């Protein structure tokens, strides 16, 4: 089956208007069930804390409960791993942050310089650098490293209250356990609920796009398609381009039908797809492909692919580290005591490696959300909210964070800012100082982040696209070599690698088109030729199955690949 016509021509991506970037809800999926679980995961054990007289420990509990957000949307087959891995990182973060806080505040309270706070800045920046690299190399979904850095920085302030790393670690682990229980609870009601929800969300997104064609609607539908395939693969329903669990084949059929509708609507509406930059969910998918996608390469392979100086993951990590440390150092020099706040602000703006204009829009969202969130905290501080009502506020914050974490930055930050300030013991400080210093720290981080987007390694995208294009050619050669000695079915690893390289090349040229349109114009025809040739190889393998390739076929395929090498 030919999945792309030989004269297929992909249009250059449209660039959304900044107002669209500012106001768009990036996902139409209903998130209230997961948000309710996140709130209850904090509320129920929080009530136990209150009953036992551990009111101040509810904030440490909340640090671990964030783990439930990382598992939402994942099939139950893999959800528990997401919760436990993120929970381990959150717990390690609060323990490390508390340990560093003891060193920092021990010296400062003994008359030492405020520059001891640079240890906190270094810790959160290191976490930001490593987390940003890993999440971009693996193309993980939101929320990424943001919550881990937020609780790590907040825990550095808990040392002033006399809590030890063991104390904060125990309470955070209790929160992780609660998150695991509530995160997996719906399994007993509908074991395949996440898969069904992902496919239904795709159908709804395509339907909404048909009713009202727009760039944002197209992106929501395309992101939903990528998510549906990812969830079906994680659930073990598809693998190797085939249906593995026939009893759930109706979900695959609905996904394919929705994909066909999306391509049809794109053609009839005239809406040209955009790059991934409307949201942080990496939509590594090509809607024009009819075959069931192959799995991504192994974790180690994806990490190794990104261990190059110009890779998206490396450049993004460098920008996060530079913006974070610069804004933190300036904040310390101005006498502010939360350098981690500046680092968190830089991370939330830069952690997914946004293009320039979307990145600036996120800076506006960060400023707006932070100002509103700080204002809410000021009101809570004024009314001296505590006990049951503090728990209620924390639960509402958890609910809102889960609802909006993949939808809109500004709204997410409104809900997370009061929680972060409470974790940092800001309730015991002068409210005027808190409002002023936190606002200025956010402003410093936004300015530093905008600067690195425009001026730190601006040519890296073009170099990385050349690197990825070369990887595509090498992957084609590897697949041809495998077909000489084995069947297409047994050449699955080489087919998987080629598909991944083609999708990565497509994603990188979308970014190149946004940031460097003149360079993208020069290589656009070559990009399309590479995509056509690569998918011609994959289509051939898909049609042959267990049948060995003939030498004549391989000769013809090799001739097409050589055209890329000779160009």
What are the residue ranges of the model-derived segments?
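Transmembrane alpha-helix boundary signature
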Residues: 97-114, 137-138, 383
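Membrane-helix boundary elements
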Residues: 84-106, 360-378
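Membrane-helix interfacial "entry" motifs
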Residues: 26-30, 74-82, 109-116, 160-164, ...
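Alpha-helical transmembrane segments of multi-pass membrane proteins
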Residues: 64, 90, 324, 343-349, ...
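Cytosolic regulatory and coupling regions of membrane transport/channel systems
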Residues: 1-51, 55, 160-173, 177-341, ...
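Hydrophobic alpha-helical transmembrane segments
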Residues: 4-7, 28-37, 56-62, 112-123, ...
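Pore- and pathway-forming membrane helices of multi-pass small-molecule/ion transporters and channels
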Residues: 10-20, 38-46, 50, 54-76, ...
């Amino acid at each position: 089956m030919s999945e792309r016509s030989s004269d297929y021509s992909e249009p250059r991506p449209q660039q959304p208007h900044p107002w669209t970037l500012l106001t768009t809800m990036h996902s139409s999926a209903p998130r209230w069930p997961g948000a309710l679980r996140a709130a209850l995961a904090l509320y129920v054990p929080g009530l136990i804390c209150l009953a036992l007289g551990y009111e101040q420990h509810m904030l440490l509990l909340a640090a671990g409960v964030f783990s439930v957000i990382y598992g939402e949307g994942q099939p139950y087959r893999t959800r528990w791993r997401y919760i436990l891995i993120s929970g381990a990182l959150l717990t390690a973060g609060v323990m490390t942050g508390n340990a560093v806080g003891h060193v920092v505040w021990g010296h400062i309270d003994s008359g030492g310089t405020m520059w001891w706070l640079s240890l906190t800045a270094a810790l959160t920046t290191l976490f930001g650098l490593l987390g940003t690299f890993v999440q971009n190399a693996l193309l993980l979904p939101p929320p990424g490293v943001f919550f881990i850095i937020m609780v790590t920085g907040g825990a550095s302030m808990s040392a002033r209250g006399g809590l030890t790393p063991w104390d904060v670690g125990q309470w955070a682990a209790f929160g992780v356990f609660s998150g695991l229980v509530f995160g997996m609870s719906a399994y007993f009601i509908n074991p395949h609920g996440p898969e069904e929800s992902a496919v239904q969300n795709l159908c709804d997104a395509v339907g909404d796009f048909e009713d009202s064609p727009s760039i944002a609607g197209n992106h929501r539908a395309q992101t939903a398609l990528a998510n549906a395939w990812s969830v079906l693969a994680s659930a073990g329903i598809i693998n190797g381009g085939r249906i593995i669990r026939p009893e759930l084949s109706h979900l695959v059929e609905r996904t394919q039908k929705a994909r066909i509708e999306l391509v049809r609507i794109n053609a009839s509406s005239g809406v040209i797809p955009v790059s991934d930059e409307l949201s942080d969910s990496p939509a590594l998918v090509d809607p024009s492909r009819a075959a069931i996608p192959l799995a991504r390469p192994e974790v180690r392979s994806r990490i190794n692919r990104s261990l190059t100086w110009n890779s998206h993951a490396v450049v993004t990590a460098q920008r996060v580290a530079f913006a974070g440390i610069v804004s933190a150092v300036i904040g310390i020099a101005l006498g502010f005591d939360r350098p981690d706040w500046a680092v968190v602000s830089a991370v939330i703006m830069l952690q997914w490696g946004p293009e320039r204009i979307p990145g600036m829009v996120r800076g506006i969202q960060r400023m707006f959300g932070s100002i509103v969130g700080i204002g809410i905290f000021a009101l809570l501080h004024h009314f001296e909210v505590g006990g049951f009502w503090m728990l209620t506020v924390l639960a509402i914050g958890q609910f809102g964070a889960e609802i909006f974490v993949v939808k809109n930055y500004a709204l997410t930050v409104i809900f997370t800012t009061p929680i972060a300030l409470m974790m940092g013991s800001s309730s015991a400080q002068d409210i005027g100082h808190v409002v002023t210093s936190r606002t200025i720290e956010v402003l410093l981080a936004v300015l530093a982040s905008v600067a690195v987007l425009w001026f730190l390694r601006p040519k890296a995208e073009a170099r990385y696209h050349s690197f990825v294009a070369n990887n595509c050619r090498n992957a084609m050669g590897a697949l041809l070599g495998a077909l000489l000695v084995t069947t297409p079915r047994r050449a699955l690893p080489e087919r998987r690698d080629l598909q991944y390289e083609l999708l990565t090349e497509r994603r990188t040229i979308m970014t190149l088109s946004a940031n460097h349109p003149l360079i993208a114009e020069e290589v656009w025809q070559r990009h399309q030729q590479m995509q056509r040739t690569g998918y011609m190889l994959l289509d051939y393998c898909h049609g042959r199955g267990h049948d060995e390739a003939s030498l004549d076929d391989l000769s013809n395929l090799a001739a097409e690949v050589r055209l890329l090498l000779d160009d």
